[in-house]
C-alpha cells in the first residue's frame, strides 16, 4: 500500500505551500527575494536537485510511522526523540494502535496556522497540519478541512502519552511540557498521524549540521517551519514557501507569526539555531529547490 501511495504521490502535480509566518531573532538580517511563481511543475525536478543539498538523499522513507513497522523491529532506532524512537517504543505502539491508517493519494499543502479570518492570505485548503502538544491550541475541526490530516511532530516521549490520553479520553498528562497543552482536543483518531522522525533527523543533521546527541543543557532543534520544507523536498516536484524571513534583531516588535502578537524577543532564548536555518533556506533558493512567494 505504501509503495502504491508513494507512486501516486510522485505522479501527482504537488504544490506544497508552507504557510508559517516565520521570523526569527538573530544579529544579522536575511531577506529572501520574491521569485516568479509562474513556473511549470517539471516532474522530478526537486528530486534531481535535492542531492546537491542533502547528502544520501532518498525518497524511500515513509512520511508517517505505521503500526506494522513496530511489531517486529529488526533494526531498532539509534536515536531518541525527536530524531528517532529509541526508548519510546511502548508508548508509540499504544498510540499507533489507535491511529491505524493508510497513506493519502496526494499531498497539496502543509499548514500549521489558523485559516479562519486569514483566507485571503493563506487560502482555505489544508492537507497536512503539523503540530506538537504545546502548539495544539486550535480547534481541529473548525480550523481544518474535513479530510485534513493532523500530523504529530514528536519531540519527546511525553508527546506520545499526551496524544494517547487525548484520543482515548484517559487521565490527562500535565507534566513534562514547556507550555501546558490542551486538556480537551476534539480530534478524529482516524485523521491523526505520527511523523516519521527520519525527517527531523535529516533536517538537523543534513541541513543544519547539528549533532544527533547533544548535552542535556544544550538542545538545539530545527523549527517546524524548516522541517515542513524538508518534508516537501522529499515528496513534491515543486515547492513554494511563503512568509519566511529573518529581519534584523533591532526590529524587536516584529511578530513571529501572522496570527499572534508574540515578538522577536521571545526567540532569543529558544532552542533553534536560526542562523543556520537562514543559510539553509538561502541555499535552497540558490539551487532552485524552492520558490519564494513573499518578500518579508
Regions found by a protein language model. Give the residues of each.
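Metal-ion/cofactor- or nucleotide/acyl-coenzyme-handling active-site neighborhoods
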Residues: 1-296
Amino acid at each position: 500500500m505504501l509503495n502504491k501511495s508513494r507512486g501516486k504521490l510522485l505522479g501527482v502535480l504537488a504544490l506544497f505551500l508552507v504557510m508559517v509566518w516565520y521570523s526569527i531573532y538573530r544579529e544579522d538580517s536575511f531577506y529572501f527575494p520574491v521569485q516568479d511563481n509562474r513556473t511549470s511543475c517539471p516532474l522530478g525536478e526537486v528530486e534531481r536537485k535535492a542531492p546537491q543539498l542533502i547528502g544520501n538523499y532518498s525518497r524511500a522513507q515513509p512520511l508517517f510511522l505505521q503500526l506494522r513497522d513496530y511489531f517486529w523491529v529488526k533494526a531498532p532506532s539509534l536515536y531518541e526523540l525527536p530524531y528517532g524512537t529509541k526508548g519510546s517504543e511502548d508508548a508509540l505502539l499504544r498510540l499507533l494502535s489507535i491511529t491505524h491508517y493508510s497513506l493519502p493519494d496526494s499531498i497539496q499543502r502543509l499548514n500549521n496556522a489558523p485559516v479562519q479570518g486569514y483566507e485571503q492570505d493563506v487560502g482555505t485548503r489544508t492537507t497536512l497540519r503539523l503540530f506538537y502538544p504545546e502548539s495544539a491550541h486550535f480547534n481541529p475541526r473548525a480550523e481544518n478541512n474535513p479530510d485534513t490530516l493532523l500530523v504529530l511532530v514528536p519531540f519527546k516521549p511525553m508527546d506520545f502519552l499526551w496524544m494517547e490520553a487525548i484520543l482515548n479520553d484517559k487521565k490527562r498528562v500535565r507534566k513534562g511540557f514547556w507550555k501546558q497543552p490542551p486538556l480537551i482536543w476534539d480530534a478524529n483518531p482516524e485523521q491523526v498521524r505520527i511523523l516519521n522522525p527520519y525527517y527531523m533527523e535529516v533536517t538537523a543533521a543534513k541541513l543544519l549540521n547539528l549533532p544527533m546527541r547533544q548535552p542535556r543543557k544544550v538542545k538545539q532543534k530545527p523549527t517546524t517551519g524548516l522541517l515542513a520544507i524538508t518534508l516537501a523536498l522529499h515528496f513534491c516536484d515543486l515547492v513554494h514557501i511563503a512568509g519566511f524571513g529573518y529581519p534584523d534583531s533591532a526590529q524587536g516588535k516584529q511578530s513571529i507569526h501572522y496570527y499572534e502578537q508574540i515578538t522577536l524577543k521571545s526567540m532569543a532564548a529558544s532552542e533553534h539555531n536560526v542562523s543556520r536555518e537562514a543559510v539553509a533556506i538561502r541555499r535552497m533558493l540558490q539551487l532552485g529547490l524552492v520558490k519564494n512567494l513573499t518578500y518579508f
